[in-house]
From Swiss-Prot:
Name under which the protein is recorded: Amylovoran export outer membrane protein AmsH
InterPro entries on file: Poly_export, Poly_export_N, SLBB_dom, Wza_C
Biological source species: Erwinia amylovora (Fire blight bacteria)
Keyword Membrane: yes
Lineage: Bacteria, Pseudomonadati, Pseudomonadota, Gammaproteobacteria, Enterobacterales
GO cellular component terms, semicolon-separated: cell outer membrane; pore complex
Major site of localization recorded for this protein: membrane
Length: 377
C-alpha cells in the first residue's frame, strides 16, 4: 500500500498546481445551486458597452469646464425697476391723515405701529373711520392711498393721506436646506432676490452643494448655480423671489467619488465646493501602492447618463509610467459618482495566486516527506 501512495504523490502535486488557476485572492460568491433569473441580455459583452479614452493633453483640455464669466441680468433689472408690493391679508397698515390727528391712531410709548395700525382682515379689507370698509388686498400702497383720500374727501376738505405697511405678514418665501438659518422670509416693499435671501439666511453651510440649488416657483423647479452667481458673478442665476417660492440648498452627500484598486487606502470621497481632480482623489487615498500598482492602468470610470444611452460608461485611462504625466491628473476634473480605479501589475496578480498555492504545496510536500519516511521504515 505504501508503494501505491508514493505513486500518487506526483498526481497530488500536479493537482495542487492545476488548482492554482482557481485559487484567487478575495471574496467569492458562487451561483451554483442558486436560482438564477435569466435576463434577455444575460450574456452581454461588457466591452461593447464602454468607451475607453486614453488621456492626452488635448483631450484633457477639451474636457475642461468652460469658465463662467460675469454677466448682467436684464430681466431681473426690469423686474426690480417695476417692482411694487401688493398688500395682502394679515398685513398691518398705518394710515395717517395730516392735520387730522383724530383720524390717526398714534403709536404710544409702549406700542409699535404694527400694534396700533389697521389690520387687513381675511376678506381683504380694513376698517377706517367715516368711510367704513376699504378693500386693500391686492392693491399697492399708492392705490390704497388714493382710494382712502377719495372717499375721505366727502368728510374732510382736501385730505392729505399717507399709507405705509407697518408690518409685512401676508407673503413669505422659504429658504431651506444647507443654510445657516433656514426658514421663512417676508416679502416686503424691498424686492427680495436669491442672493438677498441667502445672505439673510446667514450664508451657506460647509456641507452645502452650491452647484445644484433648486428654486420652486409656481410648482416648477428651476436649477440655480450659486457657484456661478457668488463666485463668478453670473447674475443670470439671480432671480426675484415671489410669494410662495421655495429655495432649496441640498447637501453635498451625492457629490461622491470612489477610489478603488491598488491605492494605499481605498475610500469614498466627498467633493467640496471647488470640486476635485484626479490627482486630488489619488492623493486623498494616500497615493498608488508603488509595490503592486500598474502605473499604466489608472482609470476613471464615468457612468453615462440618459435614457437613450448606447453605452453604460466612459473610461478614461491615464498612463503614469512617466510621473510627469500626473500633471494631466491635476487638470482632469472628476464628476460625482466617478470611480477611480488603479489596476495591479501582472506580476502582482501572479504573486497573489502563488501566495495562495504555497500552503497547499507545503502541505503536499510535508505529506510526501512523511510517506517517504514511512516507506523507509
Amino acid at each position: 500500500m505504501i508503494i501505491i501512495k508514493t505513486k500518487l504523490i506526483p498526481l497530488m502535486v500536479s493537482a495542487a498546481l492545476l488548482s492554482g488557476c482557481t485559487i484567487v485572492p478575495g471574496n467569492h460568491l458562487s451561483t451554483m445551486g442558486k436560482d438564477v433569473v435569466e435576463q434577455q441580455d444575460s450574456d452581454f459583452d461588457i466591452d461593447k458597452y464602454v468607451n475607453i479614452f486614453p488621456l492626452t493633453p488635448s483631450l484633457v483640455e477639451r474636457m475642461k469646464p468652460k469658465p463662467v464669466v460675469a454677466q448682467a441680468n436684464a430681466t431681473l433689472q426690469r423686474e426690480l425697476q417695476n417692482y411694487e408690493y401688493r398688500i395682502g391679508v394679515g398685513d398691518v397698515l398705518m394710515v395717517t391723515v395730516w392735520d387730522h390727528p383724530e383720524l390717526t391712531t398714534p403709536a404710544g410709548q409702549y406700542r409699535s405701529a404694527s400694534d396700533t395700525g389697521n389690520w387687513v382682515h381675511s376678506d381683504g379689507t380694513i376698517f377706517y373711520p367715516y368711510i367704513g370698509r376699504v378693500r386693500v388686498a391686492g392693491h399697492t400702497v399708492q392705490e390704497t392711498r388714493d382710494e382712502i383720500a377719495s372717499r375721505l374727501s366727502k368728510y374732510v376738505e382736501s385730505p392729505q393721506v399717507d399709507v405705509n405697511v407697518a408690518s409685512f405678514k401676508s407673503q413669505k418665501t422659504y429658504v431651506t436646506g444647507e443654510v445657516t438659518t433656514s426658514g421663512q422670509q417676508a416679502i416686503t416693499n424691498v424686492p427680495l432676490t436669491i442672493l438677498d435671501a441667502i445672505n439673510a439666511a446667514g450664508g451657506l453651510t460647509a456641507t452645502a452643494d452650491w452647484r445644484n440649488v433648486v428654486l420652486t416657483h409656481d410648482g416648477r423647479e428651476q436649477p440655480v448655480s450659486l457657484q456661478a452667481l457668488m463666485q463668478n458673478g453670473d447674475l443670470s442665476q439671480n432671480h426675484l423671489l415671489y410669494p410662495g417660492d421655495i429655495l432649496y440648498v441640498p447637501r453635498n452627500d451625492d457629490l461622491k467619488v470612489f477610489v478603488m484598486g491598488e491605492v494605499k487606502q481605498q475610500a469614498t470621497l466627498k467633493m467640496d465646493r471647488s470640486g476635485m481632480t484626479l490627482s486630488e482623489a489619488l492623493g486623498s487615498a494616500q497615493g498608488m501602492d508603488q509595490s503592486v500598482a500598474d502605473a499604466t492602468g489608472v482609470f476613471v470610470i464615468r457612468p453615462v447618463k440618459g435614457a437613450n444611452r448606447s453605452k453604460i460608461a466612459n473610461i478614461y485611462q491615464l498612463n503614469t509610467k512617466d510621473a510627469a504625466a500626473m500633471v494631466m491628473g491635476t487638470e482632469f476634473r472628476l464628476e460625482p459618482y466617478d470611480i477611480v480605479y488603479v489596476t495591479s501589475t501582472p506580476l502582482t496578480r501572479w504573486n497573489r495566486v502563488i501566495s495562495q498555492l504555497v500552503p497547499t504545496i507545503s502541505g503536499v510536500y510535508d505529506a510526501t516527506r512523511n510517506v517517504q519516511t514511512i516507506h523507509k521504515w
